[in-house]
């Protein structure tokens, strides 16, 4: 691996090995990334996601998603149009927002491959437990950026490397 997949910096170095998987870290942005030699096929990736227990009506999962939803709801309006990017096969986050009166579209490359979303703009985009799965994050973040309307929000929830059991929350105003 020679280039950071997040910021395209060429100063990355070996960071750690977990379960025989090599991870690299960028000196500039501090992103930690899996060495591409360990990437799995899209068929294996889809099978992996189908093993997730993220059922749409699971109360514990819905409670977990409020870590992303509640701060976002303070920033958006009911008339805003949102996108749940990487929603998975059971789009619980979108279901919660819809029940709260928000308009939200779905996109997932395996389960809701709605290519029409790439010709639209959204007032907010959510990514819950998604960005850590991007093989090409630089390209994905640019794709997402092109989908954001002016004065919009991109809400991300992912696991941190240090506190793997605690979700971290980041929102960015455009």
Q: What label would you give each PLM region?
A:
Residues 151-159:
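Conserved beta-strand signature within the Rossmann-like core of class I S-adenosyl-L-methionine
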Residues 144:
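Class I S-adenosylmethionine-dependent transferase superfamily signal
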Residues 29, 133, 166-168:
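Alpha-helical hinge/cap motifs
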Residues 128-131, 157:
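Residues lining the SAM
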Residues 1-124, 128, 138-141:
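Conserved N-terminal segment of class I S-adenosyl-L-methionine
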Residues 134-135, 148-150:
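Helix-to-beta-strand junctions that scaffold the AdoMet/dcAdoMet cofactor pocket
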Residues 162-174:
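Single conserved hydrophobic/aromatic residue that forms the stacking wall/gate
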